[in-house]
Amino acid sequence: MQRTLGGTNRKRKRTSGFRARMRTPDGRNVIRARRKRGRHRLSV
């Protein structure tokens, strides 16, 4: 039987990648908050 919870990089990038975040105002807020907090990785 096949495991279903592998996760795919295409889906991951498309939903929570940098360009996906920049596409919406709320996503831009997320990036801004992570910059302010000093996160090394801003997005996936």
From Swiss-Prot:
The keyword Ribonucleoprotein applies. It comes from the Bacteria. It holds the Pfam family Ribosomal_L34. The keyword DNA-binding does not apply. Residues 1-26 are annotated as: Disordered. One of its GO terms (cellular component) is ribonucleoprotein complex. GO terms for molecular function: structural constituent of ribosome. Coiled coil: none annotated. GO terms for biological process: translation. Residues 9-22 have a biased composition (Basic residues). Keywords: Ribonucleoprotein, Ribosomal protein. Belongs to the bacterial ribosomal protein bL34 family. NCBIfam families: rpmH_bact (TIGR01030). This is Large ribosomal subunit protein bL34. It comes from Nostoc sp. (strain PCC 7120 / SAG 25.82 / UTEX 2576). The lineage of its organism: Bacteria, Bacillati, Cyanobacteriota, Cyanophyceae, Nostocales. The gene is rpmH.
